[in-house]
Amino acid sequence: MGAAAKLAFAVFLISCSSGAILGRSETQECLFFNANWEKDRTNQTGVEPCYGDKDKRRHCFATWKNISGSIEIVKQGCWLDDINCYDRTDCVEKKDSPEVYFCCCEGNMCNEKFSYFPEMEVTQPTSNPVTPKPPYYNILLYSLVPLMLIAGIVICAFWVYRHHKMAYPPVLVPTQDPGPPPPSPLLGLKPLQLLEVKARGRFGCVWKAQLLNEYVAVKIFPIQDKQSWQNEYEVYSLPGMKHENILQFIGAEKRGTSVDVDLWLITAFHEKGSLSDFLKANVVSWNELCHIAETMARGLAYLHEDIPGLKDGHKPAISHRDIKSKNVLLKNNLTACIADFGLALKFEAGKSAGDTHGQVGTRRYMAPEVLEGAINFQRDAFLRIDMYAMGLVLWELASRCTAADGPVDEYMLPFEEEIGQHPSLEDMQEVVVHKKKRPVLRDYWQKHAGMAMLCETIEECWDHDAEARLSAGCVGERITQMQRLTNIITTEDIVTVVTMVTNVDFPPKESSL
């Protein structure tokens, strides 16, 4: 084929594909309704303009319930690119007797009228009658389908031609923020009801919510904290992030109108809440301490690990950068899981941390090198910062443990005894960097074999020399050994076993860094 013929063929394909694309129905705005408008902090009714990427299709949707013949609308509004909604001019639910009815369509305000197809009768509010389709509708439909197939083939042929011609296409860098991800399919079809605020933090608040018959946690970010929400969503979406000791991720959504937008992150809900909240109200036994500490260490070790060759891709090493007892959640059986990845940093092969700002996190838990602003921007340096903070969390656990023969302290945050509840950066620098102080390890803790081993582990986690700190994997192994050994130790053997284990049995410090 000559150059002129190729050019003519390309022009023909472009014109055909353009015609096909222009022929589809464009959705610019949809009818908006929210039955839970007060709790979701949105308008109840109105017209919602639909936003999205230029190369993505936009749709309208409606969800409703049929309660003994009475129609209750749950939500109406804009719906992001969904192949199940393509070329539907009418909003029709086709599933057989769903618990919550759902339909989507293309075209301005096409969700104003909706119906339920399998019942062969219109299921709708009386205020939104649906006009029956005339007989020639099916004829028109059968005529359009082949034409659409032909248009699709033409578009594919054009794409193949272009792909073959451009063997090395240029890398395109987005010129604008890609915006929130599309709603999770799991969430989009199900009503999500906010119940009560459980916590407030730096980047928003956490709600207990109901998703059909189960409770979930909804972390709501204001739009100005979009970067934190985006970072947390991206970390949860990495390959291999499903782990027993990492908080289970369910979905992410954008809620509200274009004027008042909130960003939602939906995760599993754990009634016991954070480790910090639990320790305020409860003391822990030696076995409970070991279980919490070991599962927390396992979660952090998995987060720190670089795992190639997973079924869904390569899991990079991840530094949390805000380890604290507030960001460790407890399941009903006291298994710990790591949460809150708004500041997390992933380390992909061949890439450095670059100009990442090092002095982030909660001041009270900042390592000496962070407080000094003297961070080596390499992977292992960031992982060791996490380990310093983990040492402080282990101290919090030890301070509320009943194992030692002595009084159990009231719950206090690390350094609260030294510098109070609201330390400044200068306060932390003075105590941690210049005076090299750490929270007090009580003398009577040393009289319990397990607590004595734990104290040594804590000291090696918060060592002033970052390179001397233990790895998370090493901490997990040590705690397993502590629990096993203390279950067989007698009172007379304490000194002998502590000496033996301290000198011989502990795994090497740098087992995974």
UniProtKB/Swiss-Prot annotation:
Cofactor requirements of the protein: Mg(2+); Mn(2+)
This enzyme's EC code(s): 2.7.11.30
Record: residues binding ATP: K198, A199, R200, G201, R202, F203, G204, C205, V206, K219
Reaction catalyzed: L-threonyl-[receptor-protein] + ATP = O-phospho-L-threonyl-[receptor-protein] + ADP + H(+); L-seryl-[receptor-protein] + ATP = O-phospho-L-seryl-[receptor-protein] + ADP + H(+)
Enzyme class: transferase
Result when mutating A367T: Found in a clear cell renal carcinoma case; somatic mutation
Cited Pfam families: Activin_recp (PF01064), Pkinase (PF00069)
Biological process according to GO: activin receptor signaling pathway; anterior/posterior pattern specification; BMP signaling pathway; cell surface receptor protein serine/threonine kinase signaling pathway; cellular response to BMP stimulus; cellular response to growth factor stimulus; determination of left/right symmetry; embryonic skeletal system development
Residue ranges of domain Protein kinase in the record: 192-485
Compartment annotation: Cell membrane
Topological domain spans for side Cytoplasmic: 162-513
Active site, per annotation: D322
Segments passing through the bilayer: 136-161
GO cellular component term, pick one: plasma membrane
Residues linked to a glycan: N43, N66
Gene Ontology molecular-function annotations: activin binding; activin receptor activity; activin receptor activity, type I; activin receptor activity, type II; ATP binding; BMP receptor activity; coreceptor activity; growth factor binding
UniProt topological domain (Extracellular) ranges: 20-135
Disulfide bonds: C30-C60, C50-C78, C85-C104, C91-C103, C105-C110
Keywords: ATP-binding, Cell membrane, Disulfide bond, Glycoprotein, Kinase, Magnesium, Manganese, Membrane, Metal-binding, Nucleotide-binding, Receptor, Serine/threonine-protein kinase, Signal, Transferase, Transmembrane, Transmembrane helix
Functional summary from the UniProt entry: On ligand binding, forms a receptor complex consisting of two type II and two type I transmembrane serine/threonine kinases. Type II receptors phosphorylate and activate type I receptors which autophosphorylate, then bind and activate SMAD transcriptional regulators. Receptor for activin A, activin B and inhibin A. Mediates induction of adipogenesis by GDF6.
Family: Belongs to the protein kinase superfamily. TKL Ser/Thr protein kinase family. TGFB receptor subfamily.
Protein's name according to its UniProt entry: Activin receptor type-2A
Species, as recorded: Homo sapiens
Gene name linked to the record: ACVR2A
